[in-house]
Amino acid sequence: MTTHRKPSQEQGFLNGQFLLAMPGMSDERFARSVVYICAHSGEGAMGFIINQLQPVQFPDLLRQIGVIGEEDLIILPDRAQHMVARNGGPVDRTRGFVLHSDDYMVDSTMPVSDDVCLTATVDILRAIYGGGGPERALMALGYSGWAPGQLEMEVAENGWLTCDAPLDMLFDSDIEGKYSRLMLHMGIDMSQLVSDAGHA
């Protein structure tokens, strides 16, 4: 049996936390974005934008990658029928990733925090299609990556706010309202927010 270790929470690293783009974000791809950080160390960082939608629906993606056929669309479980894909970031945009609750674990699963995991194999898609898989999940195409020291510099230059990532905020279906609700959760008045803010 494989033993899965939880990621270390070394001081200064942001594993399992949210980044919220500041209003002065210079990269338009990340404007008003909420990014969930999955891995952060001295070697760099990676995460997923969770509040930008992809034009492809989950059933269509399953069909495109050969998990199901056209005739299977009508028998998809309700959750799979309504699952939407997120634009995870500008890197490797054709690759799929699933962030999910820790009640699903296979050899390729990477624990991100005490209750969130990441799986990037087709097995989890088949499990969801079959009505199983994790209780809570979101799928992203592509990811966001930072070189060593790059994310730390962007945070120091007030490109991002950082905050804890409540499960309800991570997995809820209100994608378009997520940025504003997280700002309120942090006690920040958007009308007064300026680009010289710091950490929450």
Curated annotation (Swiss-Prot):
GO CC terms, sorted: cytosol
InterPro entries according to UniProt: AlgH-like (IPR003774)
Domain of life: Bacteria
Cross-referenced Pfam families: DUF179 (PF02622)
Stretches assigned to coiled coil: none
Gene3D superfamilies registered for this protein in UniProt: VC0467-like
NCBIfam families: PRK00228.1-4
Listed HAMAP family: UPF0301 (MF_00758)
Similarity comment text for this entry: Belongs to the UPF0301 (AlgH) family.
Name by which UniProt lists this protein: UPF0301 protein BOV_0485
Species for this entry: Brucella ovis (strain ATCC 25840 / 63/290 / NCTC 10512)
